[in-house]
Amino acid sequence: MASREEEQRETTPERGRGAARRPPTMEDVSSPSPSPPPPRAPPKKRLRRRLESEDEEDSSQDALVPRTPSPRPSTSTADLAIASKKKKKRPSPKPERPPSPEVIVDSEEEREDVALQMVGFSNPPVLIKHGKGGKRTVRRLNEDDPVARGMRTQEEKEESSEAESESTVINPLSLPIVSAWEKGMEAARALMDKYHVDNDLKANFKLLPDQVEALAAVCKTWLNEEHRGLQLTFTSNKTFVTMMGRFLQAYLQSFAEVTYKHHEPTGCALWLHRCAEIEGELKCLHGSIMINKEHVIEMDVTSENGQRALKEQSSKAKIVKNRWGRNVVQISNTDARCCVHDAACPANQFSGKSCGMFFSEGAKAQVAFKQIKAFMQALYPNAQTGHGHLLMPLRCECNSKPGHAPFLGRQLPKLTPFALSNAEDLDADLISDKSVLASVHHPALIVFQCCNPVYRNSRAQGGGPNCDFKISAPDLLNALVMVRSLWSENFTELPRMVVPEFKWSTKHQYRNVSLPVAHSDARQNPFDF
């Protein structure tokens, strides 16, 4: 109480120097006053109360309510003047809470005020919009709703144009970017439309490995238009067109840069045979030297093959009685060649490690290898390599499907030398074509047949699959050359098509065991219980 009375004395001026309503002069201020300074008004205590809104949806808010001080018995005029000069502080509003993702903004005015919008990485995703006034709204996006791009002002576009020009990659050719499959399909459809392929084949064509039939139809139409009456030697028209379709498929995949991991489109390989280097020496697919083995053939006298043998091979064929006392035509070949793994096997029987190569006449087989080598040198005289390679198919119609299982018998097409009858009587001086002279000087051809062929008037050995695949080595090379001509007539650039080199593998071995094969069944349970 004493201190409060002292503060009140300091606010009261001295008597004779002025009243409470008249402020003192400068002289009075300059002179020291023995009274203390006037006391300050005590701060108003504020009481925090919780006010409930009348609206049930709004949440309760906290407001600051000034607490009225308790009345005092005596209050001076100076205290009232000082208290009136102080401004009353307004209660600070509570910051707004962020809206929930359930809020949907659909008004046009709010859309115009949006300055930035982004997509939040949540589940479900939300579209977050920031207005120009600092307002932030959130809208939930459905799966089918398109994501709107952020709206930018013209000034922002001008500022970011330079940065975008540096990061944008421009196609120098100004061409649309397409996939490799679309590129191959476009080229294939152009060929099928031009050469009038069947609509069913065209509609089902998807550039798959097993769809060679549609491309073979293209090659067949092209042959009928450009090379009518094509001469083939020991080759069926169906096999020739099929091999052209395979080569065309390889060019399409190379053009579109489409590859399949476990499928080679041509179904061929280049074999470095080395069978024409040393006289009398032949090598099998293993790369080993083939051994000599006597081979005896017996045919019925009344059969067509027996009569032909008596006529064409009168020096070797003779009529004898077999062990059952019947007259047969017997041909004994002492120059037969077989794989080294078949030395202990009878004629026309092979071991489990054999490559399946067998020649009844080794000399004729070597003449056929010399013919294809001379044919390659005549066709490509300036080639540095490749004259000693043989383009050979690895798949016939039996094992042409991708992912086929090994079957009983030979796994590679059978390689057989065929003699050219009456070719020795031709005068070589009258022929100027070197490719034709290759067959005149070496009158035998290598012919590729089905892996396990079934001849006329004979039964299938082992009951394995068989087909009518048959094509000679020169015609196989001509099929590749004609596909290149077909491609050059329709496209400007010829892609690079690589035929793999042949390497021996255990998957090419002769199979003496027939494995059971399962067939797909749509039923869930095998039996009805």
Swiss-Prot record:
A GO term for molecular function: single-stranded DNA binding
Binding site for Zn(2+) 2: 396, 398, 450, 467
Function recorded in the entry: Plays a role in the elongation phase of viral strand displacement replication by unwinding the template in an ATP-independent fashion, employing its capacity to form multimers. Also enhances the rate of initiation. Released from template upon second strand synthesis. Assembles in complex with viral pTP, viral pol, host NFIA and host POU2F1/OCT1 on viral origin of replication. Covers the whole ssDNA genome during synthesis. The complementary strand synthesis induces its release from DNA template. May inhibit cellular transcription mediated by the interaction between host SRCAP and CBP.
Keywords annotated in UniProt: DNA replication, DNA-binding, Early protein, Host nucleus, Host-virus interaction, Metal-binding, Phosphoprotein, Viral DNA replication, Zinc
Annotated domain remarks: The C-terminal arm bridges DBP molecules together, thereby creating a chain.
Residue ranges with Basic residues bias: 129-139
Chief location of this protein within or outside the cell: host cell
Gene (name only): DBP
Protein name listed in UniProt: DNA-binding protein
Locations listed in the record: Host nucleus
Entry's Gene Ontology BP terms: DNA replication; DNA-templated transcription; positive regulation of DNA replication; viral DNA genome replication; viral DNA strand displacement replication
Quaternary structure and partners: Homomultimerizes on viral ssDNA bound to pTP. Forms an initiation complex with viral polymerase, pTP and hosts NFIA and POU2F1/OCT1. Interacts with host SRCAP.
Extent of Basic and acidic residues compositional bias: 1-17, 140-155
Amino acid composition bias (Acidic residues), ranges on this chain: 156-165
Region (Flexible loop): 297-331
